[in-house]
């Protein structure tokens, strides 16, 4: 369905990008108006940039404006991750995959990336910048850095990482490097 809607160009509105919006509409339609706390438009296709939540309105009416309310503010991270996901799809297309295969492979890669990030995520009190650094570390240490440049640039573009951010600021990931098939076979013996 996403390929049908976009022809492989994930910057166009599509089911996957608008999943949060559709869920909010469904909940509000079923459970009553404003049940979710607002008419959240949580499309992943956005151009939101980092701002200190203390300086933001709670939940602005303009969907292109970032708000401090947690669901509203989360659109910043969602958009940044979607930028990475779109970049992977584009890389796959450039490598010769058709739109459906590129999307399928990027979806699988995205799930693996999120899994590594969750395992290596900072605990307790952390910032979006801390999470972005953990995302970079998890890819560098668990995926041979395949998407480090893409992740770094996406999070810089969103202001989550500063423009002068250096990879030397990223510490080791607590997630162990993935085993190769040969290493896994040796460990089984």
List the model feature ranges, each with a label.
Residues 1-189:
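Zinc-dependent metallohydrolase catalytic domains
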């Amino acid at each position: 369905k996403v390929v049908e809607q976009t022809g492989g160009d994930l910057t166009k509105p599509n089911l996957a990008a608008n999943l949060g919006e559709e869920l909010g509409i469904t909940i509000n339609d079923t459970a009553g108006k404003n049940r979710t706390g607002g008419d959240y438009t949580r499309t992943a296709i956005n151009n939101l940039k980092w701002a200190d939540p203390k300086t933001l309105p709670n939940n602005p009416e303009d969907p292109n404006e970032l708000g401090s309310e947690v669901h509203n503010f989360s659109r910043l991270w969602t958009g940044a991750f979607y930028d990475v996901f779109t970049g992977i799809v584009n890389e796959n297309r450039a490598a010769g995959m058709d739109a459906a295969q590129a999307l399928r492979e990027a979806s699988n890669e995205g799930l693996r990336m999120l899994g590594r990030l969750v395992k290596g995520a900072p605990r307790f009190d952390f910032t979006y910048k801390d999470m972005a650094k953990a995302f970079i570390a998890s890819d560098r240490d668990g995926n041979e850095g395949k998407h480090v440049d893409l992740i770094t640039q996406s999070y810089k573009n969103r202001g989550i990482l500063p423009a002068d951010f250096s990879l030397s600021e990223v510490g080791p990931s607590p997630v162990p490097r993935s085993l190769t098939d040969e290493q896994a076979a040796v460990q089984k013996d």
